[in-house]
From Swiss-Prot:
This is Acyl carrier protein. Its main location: cytoplasm. It comes from the Bacteria. Residues 1-75 form the Carrier domain. The modification O-(pantetheine 4'-phosphoryl)serine is found at S35.
Amino acid sequence: MVFEKIKALIATQLSLDASTITLDTRFKEDLGLDSLDALELVMEVEKTFQINISDATLQNFKTVQDIVFYITKNTP
């Protein structure tokens, strides 16, 4: 469920086909995510899942799996 929501957020944010996004999709290398895109995506994730993601934590997100794992661990 978390993955599906994240996938939809990424697809909407970057105007992509959601079916191309997998857990192994890399933000920078595969999606071409720049710092502005990353900031906007994190703001949407924080709003959707009602969590706060620090800048330091954000720097650790390399793949979709990374953010899904973080959300799963840090939400009730």
